[in-house]
Regions:
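N-terminal cysteine/histidine-rich coordination modules
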Residues: 1-60
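Intrinsically disordered, low-complexity boundary segments flanking structured domains
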Residues: 2, 80, 103-105
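Short, exposed beta-strand/loop patches in secreted or surface proteins that constitute
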Residues: 21, 81-85, 106
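Secondary-structure transition/turn motif
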Residues: 32-35, 94-100, 135-138
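Anionic N-terminal interaction surfaces
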Residues: 36-92
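Glycine-centered tight beta-turn/hairpin loop motif at sheet-sheet or coil-to-beta transitions
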Residues: 78-80, 101, 137-141
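Phosphoinositide-binding peripheral membrane targeting modules
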Residues: 88-131
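Acidic, Ser/Thr- and proline-rich intrinsically disordered linker/docking segments
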Residues: 116-196
Length: 196
């Protein structure tokens, strides 16, 4: 006879479901608790965090919610991930969400940027994806990494490819120029799919 062990979230103690739960270094959290976390935290990063780290992160998220409510941007670059810049306060937001407050999108300080990379990840059949990677220091979030192209892998020889690369460059150049940053910026690094 099979036995089923019922597990509870180590944070809110509700019953875990098979989908959306996240594994931590010293526990597991439910989908509802995971949805409160920053969208920029990857599963790999979560596995290195403790329950105490998550509790601290949730305190940051509460403060961020108040911050995003008062966030005033003066520049916008629209795209799959849109960029919102507050030049006066040297802050920015990158988000897929239409409603930044409802999403509790992370407000990032420009001086926390350590390096930026535009990366082409090759796939099969002469196709690729274009990513922007922004590494941060002295920030609750350590990196922002996102795919620029709207659809799955794009053909190297298509207009969509050129438009996507130009969109990535525009987004990154806008960040660097708006804040007059002197950061390590790699415009083009080509990796194979296996290196990603």
């Amino acid at each position: 006879m099979d036995t089923f062990i019922e597990l509870n979230c180590d944070l809110c103690h509700s019953k875990l479901t098979p989908y959306g739960s996240k594994v931590l270094k010293d526990g597991i959290i439910c989908r509802n608790c995971a949805e409160e976390l920053s969208k920029w935290l990857t599963d790999k990063q979560l596995k290195q965090l403790s329950l105490q780290d998550i509790e601290n992160h949730l305190q940051y998220r509460t403060k961020n919610l108040e911050h995003i409510k008062n966030f005033k941007f003066d520049k916008v670059i629209k795209g799959r991930y849109s960029l919102y810049i507050d030049s006066e306060n040297r802050e920015f937001v990158i988000s897929k969400a239409m409603d930044l407050v409802a999403d509790n999108s992370d407000v990032i300080r420009a001086d926390s940027i350590e390096s930026i990379q535009i990366q082409k990840v090759n796939n099969e059949n002469n196709c690729c994806d274009i990513f922007v990677n922004i590494n941060l220091i002295n920030s609750e979030i350590t990196s922002l990494s996102f795919k620029v192209n709207q659809f799955s892998a794009i053909d190297f020889n298509s207009d969509i490819y050129n438009d996507t690369v130009n969109q990535a460059i525009l987004l990154v150049d806008t960040i660097i120029n708006s804040f007059q940053l002197d950061v390590d910026y790699t415009k083009y690094k080509i990796n194979t799919q296996g290196d990603k």
